[in-house]
Amino acid sequence: MVSRTKNRRNKARKVVSRSTALVPMAPASQRTGPAPRKPRKRNQALVRNPRLTDAGLAFLKCAFAAPDFSVDPGKGIPDNFHGRTLAIKDCNTTSVVFTPNTDTYIVVAPVPGFAYFRAEVAVGAQPTTFVGVPYPTYATNFGAGSQNGLPAVNNYSKFRYASMACGLYPTSNMMQFSGSVQVWRVDLNLSEAVNPAVTAITPAPGVFANFVDKRINGLRGIRPLAPRDNYSGNFIDGAYTFAFDKSTDFEWCDFVRSLEFSESNVLGAATAMKLLAPGGGTDTTLTGLGNVNTLVYKISTPTGAVNTAILRTWNCIELQPYTDSALFQFSGVSPPFDPLALECYHNLKMRFPVAVSSRENSKFWEGVLRVLNQISGTLSVIPGPVGTISAGVHQLTGMYM
């Protein structure tokens, strides 16, 4: 018994040394087993499932569905620009009576402070002069009597459009209306032209002196015959459309001060087409031309028809105020860069038709959500309850299909 106990104690005291054989590893190119797992990065899920920022979503709302979010002022354009900006959103609502036996042209051009330009001509005639209708906030944002007072060029250095939209909502009696509405887009641009003019001051009376003038190009696209890409429908159906950025990436534009924008090239005996400030510029002047398309509405009213409608226009503009401007105190830091919002914008702008009827306007944001779903694969990119509900299950899109 004693010997057994001693043997057990001796065994317990023995130090057991074990050696582990090293197994040679094959080169990476010759391995056949599963690849070793890499450590998961903390932000890997965010990279795989990017989400729109709040500023990016506000930008898309203002760009494509301004009527659905009229009280949302927007937060600017979430691109690579960094600085102080002032974002404003204008809305104009007016009742329009269309003259029988005429073609009425409503031109919504990216001129800061102006809701639209209007011209009335005989049926089939070529319009030449379009008189502007300013927004009610023109005096607040750009100064009243800007021809002789403080113009916009003294308050802001540059501007750019985030969005511009227009809707025609007929209010005619169903038994009295007649006619049609056509909608299309044109590209207008300002160019510099060096023109000779006779001056009575310098260098001497009667001597020609060159000066640089701003002229407009593209007005010939506003004509009686609509281009191939257009929306055509009955007047009673109305129409809604929006403009989109036609520059590289929301380029900043300079402010100017002009009483009119006239064509630079007039062919043959044609009359020069022009955009005019109302009242000869005593209260307002044309402030510039922005970076988005121009919207053209042509309403044809036959003899005996009684056509009336509500015309609404919206725009979202981003401004760079001068530090000595009274509006500088209302400016804020530009929104952070959101590449997903910009990618969605450039994909969305080419997927929608030129225009839709006014009754389809009420569900336009739902159409934007459907296209977002096609682009991103899931609506979970949208922050807030919408993204939470739709993550992984696509239920929201199914509700709107």
UniProtKB/Swiss-Prot annotation:
Enzyme type, top EC level: hydrolase
Region (Disordered): 1-43
Disulfide links within the chain: 62-316
Listed GO CC annotations: T=3 icosahedral viral capsid
Keyword list, A-Z: Aspartyl protease, Calcium, Capsid protein, Disulfide bond, Hydrolase, Metal-binding, Protease, T=3 icosahedral capsid protein, Viral penetration into host cytoplasm, Viral penetration via permeabilization of host membrane, Virion, Virus entry into host cell
Residues given in the record as Ca(2+) 1 binding sites: 272
Site (Cleavage): 361-362
Name used for this protein in its record: Capsid protein alpha
Gene: alpha
